[in-house]
């Protein structure tokens, strides 16, 4: 049946909608507001005190001889205590050190002290700075790089969904068919002793990859249970599916109207709900979902950080942060439970909280800070809710052939929010998957720039899937960065080509090559929990642009491994206004480092996704070791 299209859409994924995030608030109420940590100044000062120019190598000749004739540490002996990281000096040598510093891209050795990089360069120069008592770590031919930065994602939402059964398709999960989904949901009931708060919960199923090639419905979930409510999130997080017991519990029936900005899908030719709740209709389910405790969420956050560290990530992002998420992350920082740094970009509905100082904007932090604000201007292409200038290749059921997705806010509202951010000196991100949404954001930036004058604002187009060449030209003039969700080429490339955008537009998604050709800075991200925050997949996807079926999508937009590394190191740090302390291996910067068994620049491009992470180091301390 046909559905009226609302003028503006409120999508249901963490990167494009208030709806799922309202669910998160319901999941952990009562979290008190925590201030940012102000501790750590002494550690930083200690590191900075060691800086100052490179000393003459001749003056340290004896130290050089003594230091580099000492026995090397074995790979298994590289884990250091907090005391060693804070007070000792450690020298790494004996491998490939890719600094990501364009003026000195390779180094022979790196010295680390007080959580900072003391020196990087030749063995002789580094040994002179480090002195005879420095600890030596032999890289044994491995490769050291700056720690990876996944500069757009939703780490708090990722933690929440860790408590759901994984319904993702391979390689992120075990699902190939609807029968697999049923089996996994039954496993959830078994391992939780009957469900969580009576509910059976799963997330990240993707109907475009199911053997049955159809959407999940209440009938499928009724096979899991007729007595307990069952809920499954779609991979886009724009849709949930519930069973008959859940519909009854939620009071959703044939008489229930579609809520504003959402759709209750019905069985063909009837008004009877089929269990699929889209966009704004998701909010009908949220108040009845079980709530996670503060301690449960902290434990889940610990687990997520361990995964990030195992992927070489030392800085992550919490995009579209809500107040409960801010409180959770602040609490984690206060309890010293952040292994990695987290930069938050509160949802635009919290502009007033920021203006009042209820949520503090600051550049300095101890593990957690607020970096700016995030606007949501459209939805997602895989769910066909991204706002495009031309119709979808295959329109969703119930919409006319000119369907192009939805805007979230009107032009005046978008311009007003950007103007407010400029006036207050806040960095602004905007979620723009569709080129129409990008047009809206670029126009708002242009208008605000004319009013407030040029400046180093680093406004960023998040996802940037369908940016046109003329838009890149305009962005370059305005100093606007794109941050590409480049793994779309693998996860949904075939879907985009065959159903979402058509062959021509699909070949141009994530146009990183022409971005580089313009001399623009850019970043690459995974948008977790939409896909796992594995930066190796970012490298592999950007370099190969290969779909699940093995087809190359837009060969002309392939980039080199070195260029891809920029997008998760120095340029990603630049996006966060942190390129002065992160993103490259240079004296004075944080000792955020990753060691890999292979050199990503030298291995065959197809092996990038299998790059072996040997060790991840955060502020001089090992947080992961294989």
Stretches with model-predicted labels:
Residues 23-44, 51-60:
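N-terminal secretory signal peptides and thylakoid transit peptides that target proteins
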Residues 1-35:
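N-terminal secretory signal peptides
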Residues 418-429, 436-459, 463-464, 469-473, ...:
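His/Asp/Glu-enriched, well-ordered alpha-helical/loop segment
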Residues 335, 361-364, 476:
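Acidic (Asp/Glu)-rich catalytic clusters
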Residues 30, 50-101:
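C-terminal segment of N-terminal export signals and the immediately downstream linker at the start
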Residues 82-93, 98, 102-356, 375-437, ...:
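Divalent metal-binding segments
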Residues 368-384, 480-489:
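Non-cysteine beta-strand/loop elements that form the S-adenosyl-L-methionine
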Residues 341-369, 458-464, 503-517:
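Phosphate/diphosphate-binding loops
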């Amino acid at each position: 049946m046909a559905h009226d299209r609302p003028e503006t859409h409120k999508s249901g994924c963490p990167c494009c909608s208030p709806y799922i995030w309202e669910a998160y608030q319901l999941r952990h109420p009562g979290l008190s507001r925590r201030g940012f940590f102000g501790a750590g100044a002494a550690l930083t000062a200690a590191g900075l005190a060691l800086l100052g120019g490179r000393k003459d190598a001749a003056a340290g000749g004896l130290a050089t001889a003594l230091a580099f004739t000492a026995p090397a540490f074995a790979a298994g002996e590289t884990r250091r205590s907090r005391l060693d990281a804070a007070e000792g000096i450690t020298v790494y040598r004996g491998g490939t050190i890719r600094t990501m510093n364009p003026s000195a891209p390779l180094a022979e050795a790196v010295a680390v002290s007080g959580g900072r990089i003391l020196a990087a360069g030749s063995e002789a120069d580094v040994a002179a700075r480090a002195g005879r008592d420095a600890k030596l770590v032999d890289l044994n031919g491995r490769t050291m790089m700056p720690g990876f930065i996944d500069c757009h994602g939703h780490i708090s939402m990722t933690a929440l969904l860790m408590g759901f059964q994984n319904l993702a398709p391979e390689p992120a999960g075990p699902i190939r068919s609807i029968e697999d989904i049923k089996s996994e949901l039954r496993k959830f009931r078994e391992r939780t002793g009957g469900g969580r708060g009576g509910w059976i919960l799963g997330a990240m199923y993707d109907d475009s990859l199911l053997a049955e090639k159809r959407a999940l419905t209440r009938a499928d979930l009724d096979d899991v249970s007729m007595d307990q409510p069952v809920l499954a999130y779609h991979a886009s997080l724009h849709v949930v599916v519930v069973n008959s017991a859940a519909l009854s519990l939620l009071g959703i029936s044939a008489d229930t109207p579609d809520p504003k900005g959402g759709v209750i899908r019905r069985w063909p030719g009837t008004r009877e709900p089929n269990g699929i709740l889209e966009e704004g209709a998701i909010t009908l389910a949220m108040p009845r979902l079980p709530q996670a405790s503060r301690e449960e969420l902290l434990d889940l956050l610990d687990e997520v950080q361990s995964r990030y560290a195992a992927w070489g990530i030392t800085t992550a992002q919490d995009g579209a942060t809500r107040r409960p998420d801010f409180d959770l992350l602040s609490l984690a920082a206060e309890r010293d439970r952040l292994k990695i740094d987290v930069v938050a970009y509160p949802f635009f509905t919290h502009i007033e909280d920021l203006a009042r100082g209820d949520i503090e904007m600051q550049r300095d932090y101890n593990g957690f800070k607020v970096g700016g604000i995030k606007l949501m201007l459209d939805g997602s292409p895989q769910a066909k809710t991204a706002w495009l200038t031309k119709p979808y290749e295959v329109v969703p059921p119930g919409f006319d052939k000119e369907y192009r997705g939805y805007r979230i806010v009107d032009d005046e509202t978008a311009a007003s929010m950007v103007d407010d951010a400029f006036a207050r000196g806040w960095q602004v991100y905007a979620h723009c998957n569709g080129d129409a949404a990008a047009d809206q954001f670029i126009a708002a930036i242009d208008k605000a720039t004319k009013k407030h004058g040029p400046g180093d604002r680093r406004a960023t187009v998040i996802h940037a899937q369908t940016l046109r060449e003329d838009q890149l030209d305009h962005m370059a003039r305005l100093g606007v960065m794109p941050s590409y969700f480049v793994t779309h080429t693998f996860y949904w490339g075939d879907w985009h080509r065959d159903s979402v955008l058509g062959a021509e537009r699909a070949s141009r998604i994530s146009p990183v090559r022409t971005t580089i050709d313009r001399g623009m800075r850019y970043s690459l991200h995974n948008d977790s929990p939409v896909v796992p925050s594995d930066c190796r997949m970012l490298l592999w996807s950007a370099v190969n642009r290969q779909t699940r079926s093995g087809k190359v999508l837009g060969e002309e937009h392939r980039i080199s491994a070195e260029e891809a590394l920029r997008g998760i190191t120095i340029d990603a740090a630049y996006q966060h206004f942190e390129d002065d302390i992160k993103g490259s291996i240079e004296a004075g910067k944080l000792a955020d480092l990753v060691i890999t068994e292979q050199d990503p620049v030298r291995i065959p491009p197809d092996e990038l996704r299998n790059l072996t992470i040997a060790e991840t180091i955060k502020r001089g301390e090992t947080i992961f070791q294989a």
